[in-house]
Curated annotation (Swiss-Prot):
Catalyzed reactions per annotation: adenosine 5'-phosphosulfate + ATP = 3'-phosphoadenylyl sulfate + ADP + H(+)
Family membership: Belongs to the APS kinase family.
Protein's recorded name: Adenylyl-sulfate kinase
Domain of life: Bacteria
C-alpha cells in the first residue's frame, strides 16, 4: 500500500509546551539522543540495540527501542516495501524518534534504512549532535550465514524481490558517528564500546 502525504495546513501551528526539552532531560539526568542503528538484515542491529538498552536500564537511564519489525505491526502497518513506502516508513520513525528525544529519552532505533538520503532526512530533524548514526558493520557473507529468518535463502531463490544486499543496494554510511565491528566482536564488547561512546559524547555520565 502506498503512502499519501497530506499537504500542510497553514492554520496548523506548533504548540509550545511550558515544560521544556531541557527540563525533561534534566529530570532524567541524561542528554536526549537518537542512536540510529543501520546495517544489513542479520547484521545484529536489534540484538545489539536491545543489549545496550538493557545495560542502560540497569544503570537507571531512560530509553526506548524502536525496532523495524515491531513498528510494522502498528504505526507503519499500512506500508509495504516499495521504495516510496520504505521512505515513508523511515520518515515516520524519524518523526517519532524526534518526539521521544523531545521527551528527554535516549532513543535506539534498529532499521536497515539502506539509503543515505533517508538517514540524512532523520539527521536533519534533530539538533546538531543529537543524531548518532551507528553502522552495524557486518559483512554480507556473515549475515547470510546467520540468516535468522531465512530471508537471504528466499531472496537467493527469487522468492523475495528487492531484498537489501542481494538485488537492492545498501548504501554504506560514509562517516558514521560509530562504526561498530559487529562481525568481529561479541555482544558485551560491543555494548562496552557503545557505552564508552555515549559517555564521551556527554549523553550519559557514570552512575
Amino acid at each position: 500500500m502506498s503512502s499519501v502525504i497530506a499537504q500542510k495546513d497553514e492554520n496548523v501551528v506548533w504548540h509550545q509546551h511550558a515544560v521544556t526539552k531541557t527540563q525533561r532531560a534534566d529530570l532524567k539526568q541524561q542528554k536526549p539522543a537518537v542512536l540510529w542503528f543501520t546495517g544489513l538484515s542479520g547484521a545484529g542491529k536489534s540484538t545489539v540495540a536491545g543489549a545496550l538498552e538493557n545495560r542502560l536500564a540497569e544503570q537507571g537511564f531512560h530509553t526506548y527501542l524502536l525496532d523495524g519489525d515491531n513498528v510494522r505491526h502498528g504505526l507503519c502497518s499500512d506500508l509495504g516495501f516499495s521504495t516510496q513506502d520504505r521512505r515513508e516508513n523511515i520518515r515516520r520513525i524519524g518523526e517519532l524518534a524526534k518526539l521521544m528525544a523531545d521527551a528527554g529519552l535516549i532513543v535506539l532505533t534498529a532499521f536497515i534504512s539502506p539509503h543515505r538520503a533517508e538517514r540524512q532526512l532523520v539527521r536533519d530533524l534533530l539538533p546538531e549532535g543529537e543524531f548518532i548514526e551507528v553502522f552495524v558493520n557486518t559483512s554480507l557473507e556473515v549475515c547470510e550465514q546467520r540468516d535468522p529468518k531465512g530471508l537471504y535463502k528466499k531472496a537467493r531463490a527469487g522468492e523475495i524481490a528487492n531484498f537489501t544486499g542481494i538485488d537492492s543496494e545498501y548504501e554504506v554510511p560514509l562517516n558514521p558517528e560509530i562504526d561498530l565491528p559487529a562481525g568481529e566482536k561479541g555482544i558485551e564488547a560491543l555494548v562496552d564500546l557503545l557505552v564508552e561512546q555515549l559517555t564521551l559524547r556527554g549523553v550519559i555520565s557514570p552512575r
